[in-house]
Regions:
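Eukaryotic scaffold repeat domains enriched in small/polar residues
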Residues: 1-203
Length: 204
């Protein structure tokens, strides 16, 4: 109504409000919403201005913690500009699931990979890819969890893949949970066990 009564100059000064389109949503243990969106400028990803994953409070403010060495954007490098490469470009998340320990995983549709982060925004691991081998996907459309297991729905394969963590993965979960619970000595011991299995693991 006000726009009808406004002058051309006044309308030009009014900011247009375009709501963000979210393509999936998950509820965490504290009642906050984790959401994913593919509506962003890819040039703003590395600076952190674009937020493809968000944790929203009751008034819609993003309160996702990003204290890791990089932003929560999935792949940190990708082919830019005009390219004929299949599955090129930045990660585009289609779903998110939040475990009871506040660790969350997101499904990337560009490269068919899963990225898992702790509550501080540290990348714990990334895996997957395009293909029909074990651990790879053709067209992942949904991600869910049951305990520590991740369940991926692939619409092209017409199947649900259940991904169970290895002993190494369970140790990473355990060390992360202990650290966030304030059990620093116990967490350090568990991280040492992680280091025995992977001496290049940055968080350990």
């Amino acid at each position: 109504m006000w726009r009808l009564r406004s002058t051309k100059e006044q309308r030009a000064q009014q900011a247009s409000f375009v709501p963000t389109e979210y393509n999936n949503i998950a509820l965490d243990s504290e009642g906050f919403f984790f959401v994913t969106t593919q509506t962003f400028n890819s040039n703003e990803l590395t600076s952190g201005a674009a937020k493809p994953v968000r944790r929203l409070n009751a008034i819609g403010t993003n309160i996702l913690i990003e204290n890791g060495t990089s932003h929560v954007i999935g792949d940190l490098q990708w082919a830019r500009g005009d390219t004929n490469i299949t599955n090129s470009g930045p990660s585009k998340f289609v779903d998110v699931t939040v475990l009871d320990n506040d660790i969350y995983s997101v499904m990337d549709k560009t490269h068919n990979r899963i990225f898992t982060y702790d509550k501080q925004g540290n990348l714990l691991w990334a895996f997957g890819g395009v293909g029909n081998m074990d651990g790879y996907f053709l067209n992942p459309v949904a991600l869910e969890h049951q305990g520590y297991d991740l369940l991926v729905l692939d619409s092209q394969d017409c199947c649900v893949t259940v991904l169970t963590p290895t002993e190494y993965g369970k140790l990473v979960y355990k060390a992360t949970e202990q650290y966030h619970a304030g059990e620093y000595a116990a967490s350090a011991d568990t991280w040492r066990e992680v280091m025995k299995r992977n001496g290049n693991y940055d968080l350990a």
